[in-house]
């Protein structure tokens, strides 16, 4: 879950492994995102916190009824929250790519940055991606890499598809993934 920041048990959804982002880095990313026309989404293990939600994103979240979110007015609302992922949301992907170009190099080195759904720039700690999480899960379950099939459709799935013994892209995959 969350690009590999969480590994949950299918039996009861308890957290098997969690990888959090540095709180200080999250604070800097939040302040940076405030300069742009983006909805900022901050994920903890069980709650999605949203700053500057727009109508389009609100409709999308309502469509996914299982998504519990809380609107926030500032980063201060996140005091004591263990942050596992952040996202900048804008429906213009070129705009998100421009934001990435303006990020300090040290952030790019500290982050695992990916894009998804033609609307999100996803920001995780550098140690996190779906491929690494799949490898950890395979080790926990004693499953050989060659016995794993991974299916994906977005840029954030690339590491998982590459790790698996058989990587599959769905028919409508982004071209650079397939």
Language-model regions, residue ranges each:
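Conserved acidic, metal-coordinating active-site core of Asp-based
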Residues: 28, 32, 36-151, 155, ...
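Zn-dependent metallopeptidase/amidohydrolase metal-coordination segment
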Residues: 171-172
């Amino acid at each position: 879950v969350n690009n590999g920041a969480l590994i949950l048990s299918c039996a009861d959804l308890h957290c098997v492994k969690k990888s959090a982002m540095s709180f200080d880095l999250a604070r800097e990313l939040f302040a940076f995102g405030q300069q742009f026309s983006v909805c900022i989404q901050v994920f903890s293990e069980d709650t999605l916190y949203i700053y500057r939600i727009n109508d389009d994103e609100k409709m999308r979240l309502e469509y996914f009824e299982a998504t519990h979110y809380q609107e926030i007015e500032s980063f201060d609302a996140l005091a004591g929250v263990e942050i596992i992922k952040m996202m900048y949301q804008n429906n213009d992907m070129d705009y998100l790519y421009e934001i990435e170009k303006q990020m300090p190099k040290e952030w790019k080195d500290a982050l695992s940055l990916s894009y998804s759904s033609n609307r999100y720039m996803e920001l995780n700690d550098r140690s996190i991606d779906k491929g690494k999480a799949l490898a950890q899960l395979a080790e926990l379950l004693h499953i050989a890499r060659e016995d794993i099939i991974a299916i994906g459709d977005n840029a954030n799935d690339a590491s998982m598809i590459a790790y698996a013994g058989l990587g599959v892209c769905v028919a409508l995959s982004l071209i650079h993934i397939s």
